[in-house]
Design a protein with these regions (language model features):
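SAM-dependent transferase fold signal centered on methyltransferase-like domains
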Residues: 2-193
Length: 193
């Protein structure tokens, strides 16, 4: 038996012998499915549907995922992976490492193709200092940004307004990642890989 639920389902409300499957269509987390003990295969799973193909990530035992400095590439795991608690499994499957032990971003030295994460090429990586950010953005000819924030407080709309002058006239679109790296506030300016 299965029960469809909202993707924001409180995991604590799920009986311990039931499986929770988080389903995303592309990068949009759409639903959670609870599987009864008779149908359950694992405690959780992430399913990502891309162009008609179904990709599933299951829990798997393995070595602890290393934590290190950000690399040349950054993986932003699919929301189905993060909700299912399978970031470590994704890291082991892709040969990547975490940039902070409490944050879901993963790092790589080379591009990684996986349906379970968006891979970004890192153009600039350094400690988070808002006062220096405008100069870093201008130096890269960035004119518009998608801001991703994990592990740091702050209002992305306020930051976007503060960066408006730095973004004026730039020709490149980028993703600004505000996060933590090895427990330090960190900023990465990235483009799609």
């Amino acid at each position: 038996m299965s029960v469809k639920a909202a993707p924001g389902l409180d995991r604590a409300a799920v009986p311990p012998v039931w499986e929770v499957e988080f389903v995303a269509v592309g990068t949009d987390l759409k639903e959670a499915v609870l599987w009864s003990p008779a149908a359950a295969e694992a405690a959780s799973r992430a399913t990502v549907l891309v162009d008609g193909d179904r990709h599933t990530l299951l829990p798997a035992p393995g070595a602890e995922v290393p934590v290190g400095e950000p690399g040349e590439y950054l993986l932003d795991p699919n929301p189905a992976v993060t909700r299912a608690g399978l970031v470590a499994e994704l890291a082991r499957a892709t040969g990547t490492w975490q940039i902070d032990d409490r944050i879901a971003f993963l790092a790589a030295a080379a591009p990684v193709a996986t349906p379970f994460a968006r891979t970004l090429r890192v153009l600039d990586s350094g400690p988070w200092r808002e006062k220096d950010l405008g100069a870093r953005i201008r130096a890269l000819d960035v004119g518009s940004v998608d801001i991703r924030r994990r592990g740091l407080a702050g209002d992305v709309d306020v930051l976007r307004k503060r960066l408006a002058r730095a973004l004026a006239g730039g020709g490149r679109r980028a993703t600004l990642v505000m996060t933590r790296a090895r427990d330090r506030p960190w900023a990465l300016i990235c483009v799609d890989a």
